[in-house]
From Swiss-Prot:
Annotated organism of origin: Drosophila melanogaster
Binding residues for ATP: 10-18, 33
Active-site residues (renumbered): 128 (proton acceptor)
Protein keywords: ATP-binding, Cell cycle, Cell division, Kinase, Mitosis, Nucleotide-binding, Nucleus, Phosphoprotein, Serine/threonine-protein kinase, Transferase
PANTHER family: CELL DIVISION PROTEIN KINASE, CYCLIN-DEPENDENT KINASE 1
Modified residues (Phosphotyrosine): 15, 160
CDD domains per UniProt: STKc_CDK1_euk
Subunit structure: Forms a stable but non-covalent complex with a regulatory subunit and with a cyclin. Component of the Frs-CycA-Cdk1 complex composed of Cdk1, CycA and Z600.
Gene3D superfamilies in alphabetical order: Phosphorylase Kinase, domain 1, Transferase(Phosphotransferase) domain 1
Family label: Belongs to the protein kinase superfamily. CMGC Ser/Thr protein kinase family. CDC2/CDKX subfamily.
Domain Protein kinase: 4-287
Species classification: Eukaryota, Metazoa, Ecdysozoa, Arthropoda, Hexapoda
Name this protein carries in UniProt: Cyclin-dependent kinase 1
Regulation: Phosphorylation at Thr-14 or Tyr-15 inactivates the enzyme, while phosphorylation at Thr-161 activates it.
């Protein structure tokens, strides 16, 4: 640890405090994620070991790089490359009447999806995608951070706990208690983020799990066996759910062109089996004519 110094606290991560720091040897500015260990007996928590092992495997230009792992007494520090801005802060910093440039939205969506495709091909889910853990720099690069809740998945997909994704970006199969889920949970989250970039407003701002579901149902209509076979058998599905019968999504997306709307509709398909894949997102007509170079924000 003597090679690093803390400069200031910059936030609370999933497992502990995050500091801006400096490498004393190179002068490089870094992000230091401190994970407190409960006691000396327990050693490094399995959650941290999982995060470390994942991040060391995931080397990609759109994934935050883990530089080093350090132990100090009953603490572990994860040393990451430092980016000072995240997508939420960036959107919040724009004037109220200003929308993100459409080319920047396309560029960010392409980069985020490229990172997630890279993960999905390695059998890794992120499971906690949200604007707060998408870090950006001035050159137009966006990187996915905080794989704290990511986990390698095998085939068949294991039964997971379902407390994972921040409420507003949480997939319906998770909210309805599905014991098995896979890559489509990340696609749903990206669809919500895409809509938020295009409109400056979160699409489904629920304040409880049931409120979150009802907000989805109001906009996308209440799912039925016809559009989502098996939905009524999910543990938290109730026959008493209100029945909204029209899809209002297009009304929420006034700033998007027809290809953009079509892509979001495919990302927000209720049935995970039919939700678009990361690979197919990148090949969608929304990206026709798009040069995958960076767009300055």
């Amino acid at each position: 640890m003597e090679d690093f110094e803390k400069i200031e606290k910059i936030g609370e991560g999933t497992y502990g405090v995050v500091y801006k720091g400096r490498n004393r040897l190179t002068g490089q500015i870094v992000a230091m994620k401190k994970i407190r260990l409960e006691s000396d007996d327990e050693g490094v928590p399995s959650t941290a070991i999982r995060e470390i092992s994942l991040l060391k495997e995931l080397k990609h230009e759109n994934i935050v790089c883990l530089e080093d792992v350090l132990m100090e007494e009953n603490r572990i520090y994860l040393i990451f490359e430092f980016l000072s801005m995240d997508l939420k802060k960036y959107m919040d910093s724009l004037p109220v009447d200003k929308h993100m440039e459409s080319e920047l939205v396309r560029s960010y969506l392409y980069q985020i999806t490229s990172a997630i495709l890279f993960c999905h091909r390695r059998r890794v889910l992120h499971r906690d995608l949200k604007p707060q853990n998408l870090l950006i720099d001035k050159s137009g690069l966006i990187k996915v951070a905080d794989f704290g809740l990511g986990r390698s998945f095998g085939i068949p997909v294991r039964i997971y706990t379902h407390e994972i994704v921040t409420l507003w970006y949480r997939a319906p199969e998770v909210l309805l208690g599905s014991p098995r889920y896979s890559c489509p949970v990340d696609i749903w989250s990206i669809g919500c983020i895409f809509a938020e970039m295009a409109t400056r407003k979160p699409l489904f701002q629920g304040d409880s799990e049931i409120d979150q579901l009802f907000r989805m149902f109001r906009i996308l209509k209440t799912p039925t066996e016809d559009i989502w076979p098996g939905v009524t058998s999910l543990p938290d599905y109730k026959n008493t759910f209100p029945c909204w019968s029209t899809n209002q999504l297009t009304n929420q997306l006034k700033n998007l062109d027809a290809n953009g709307i079509d892509l979001i509709q495919k990302m927000l398909i209720y049935d995970p089996v039919h939700r678009i894949s990361a690979k197919d997102i990148l090949e969608h007509p929304y990206f026709n004519g798009f040069q995958s170079g960076l767009v300055r924000n």
